[in-house]
Design a protein with these regions (language model features):
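Basic, Lys/Arg-enriched alpha-helical interface segments
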Residues: 1-66, 100-102
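Enriched for short, Lys/Arg-rich terminal
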Residues: 71-75, 79-103
Length: 103
């Protein structure tokens, strides 16, 4: 049985999810709720298999490596902390937005 990681969601990522929900709710409250549920399901799945996801470009120490997982038109950026067996969700952005330079 694979090791399960705990998940933490940064205040920035929570704010991102709230903004996404508010923006989509303007045109379709039902779609907004469904989208947020899908994003949270994708985040929850990171507890079992966080490593296969694409690595954000850039030279970083392994502990600073940022990975990304696309879901619908959005991208979830996260970091894996092997020492604490934790997946840290950093931010959630629309795929058309420029990738963050800093996390």
């Amino acid at each position: 049985m694979p090791l399960k990681y705990s998940i933490t969601i940064s205040p920035r990522a929570i704010a991102d999810l709230n903004i996404i929900h508010a923006h989509v709710s303007i045109s379709s409250p039902q779609s907004a709720t469904s989208l947020i549920q899908d994003l949270f399901r994708a985040i929850d799945r990171l507890n079992e298999l966080p490593h296969p996801h694409a690595i954000q470009s850039g030279r970083r120490k392994p502990s600073q490596t940022v990975r990304r997982v696309p879901i619908h038109r959005f991208v979830i950026y996260f970091r894996i902390d092997e020492a604490t067996q934790t997946v840290n969700v950093l931010t959630v952005r629309h795929g058309s937005r420029q990738r963050p330079r800093r996390f």
